[in-house]
Every structure is written in structure tokens, then in C-alpha cells.
Amino acid sequence: MDHNKLYQLLIDDKFFDVVVELTDEEDVLSINAHKIILCASCEYFEKLFTLFREKNQSKITIKVPNRYVVRDIIIGFYKKNIQPCINNWKYQLDLVVCRDFLGLKINSDMIKNVIVPLEGFELLIKVIDLIGFFDETIGIIIRNIPKDYDKSILSDELLDKITNRTEVLNKNMSETESTIQFIVNSSKYQYIKLEMSHKIKYIQEFLEFMCKYDVWDNKDKFLLTVKPIDYKCPCPTKYSDVSFMIKFFTIYLEAKKVNLTN
């Protein structure tokens, strides 16, 4: 199927068989659509056009949480990606609400980077209630909870989860700040001391860099160890410190980033 042609039919108002009026608390807007596309894409519309009186109607009115967001969702049924308003916290939250209203899948990834102002926190709680309260969503709440927010408004269960998650995050942060990593090349009798704890992706890219420029060999044996921040490396004198290579790797990463943006 040519999805570009399908979307063009929507834009040109060709062969449509239903006018969908989307109304919310502020206003109403209309979109011409095709029942077969709506039914195939969304269980809400499938039931609407098969089980209820709307199945024989060419114009229907639906009261929705946000008319603009639902319009964008319908356009998405035509495989046209609408650029989400990633900097609009209200749009991000309403997208979850509207997808839930239509019976579409929702998950925490949809709001993982959302930052809401004070007036948006109550809506954030309602949205997360739809998604579910687990580590990721509790973390989103912790990141957004206002400094002077009256936590007594929240349920005891949610407060317990926030408290437990905060303790875990603080513990992980404390452990990260109090540890240091060593990469030991036992084949070359060299070691590298990292100034902070890096994720495994960084370590892998660094090893690829070292092998790419023939400093190390991909057949060498590497060992990654984590030690307390005040740990003094007791490496035998035959082991040499080549931590200066981190500076070259940093330059390499910056150059790589510039090339990707050009």
C-alpha cells in the first residue's frame, strides 16, 4: 500500500465516507475520514461503526479530551507521522489521555522526558495513574513534584512508592559518586583509570577506539573493575598507566559529533 497516496486522499478529501466532528470543552473541529481506515486502526472506531447507530451515519460527533490531539492521532492512522509537540507538556500529557480514550496503547516512554510546571502536576498524576505506578513513572513524579507540594494530597500507597524510589535513587547516586572504574589490559600490562563511572556503552566505544588506532588489539584481554574513590591502584610496576588516552578519546568523540551534525 502506498501510504503517501493514502495520506493524500485524506488531504484532498477524496473518497471519504464519514465526517468526524471532534468536540472538547473549548470548541469543535471536523475531519473527513474513511471508516475502513478508522476501524482497522482503532478498536474504538471499529465498535462505533459496527455496534452502534453511527454505523449508518455519514457524520458523527465525538466528545474528546483534546480535539487537536485526537485529530493528530487520526491523521497518524494514515501513516503520516505528526511531529509531536515535545516541548509542550500539556500536549504530551493529553496525548496519553486521548490514546487511552480511544483504547490505544500507552506507556511511560510517551512522557519520559516531560517537565511540567506547578499547574500541570495534578494532570501528570492523573496521566501516570492511567499508565501505572512503577519505577519509571515514579521517577517522573519525583522529577516533577513541586518543592512545596502538599504530599498529604497523595495516597498513602503512592507516597510509599515515592519514598522507596527516592531512597533507591539516592543510594545509586551515592554509590556512583563514591566509586571509580579501571580498565585493565592484561595482555599489554596497561591500565586506565576513569575519572567517573561510565555506562557500558562508553566503555565499549572506548575499547573500539583503542583497537581502531592500534593502541590495543581486539584479541587482548580486558578487565573492568569498580573500586572505591579513594582506592590506590596496587598494580605491579610492570603495569603502566595509560589514562592519558582518555583525552584523545574525548577529542575523538567531539570530532565524531561535529561530523554527524554537518
Curated annotation (Swiss-Prot):
Name of the protein this chain belongs to: Putative BTB/POZ domain-containing protein L834
| Gene3D superfamilies to which the protein is assigned, alphabetical | Potassium Channel Kv1.1, Chain A (3.30.710.10)
Taking every annotated instance into account, which residue ranges of this chain make up the domain BTB? Answer: 16-86
Q: Name one Pfam family in it.
A: BTB
The family line of this record is: Belongs to the mimivirus BTB/WD family.
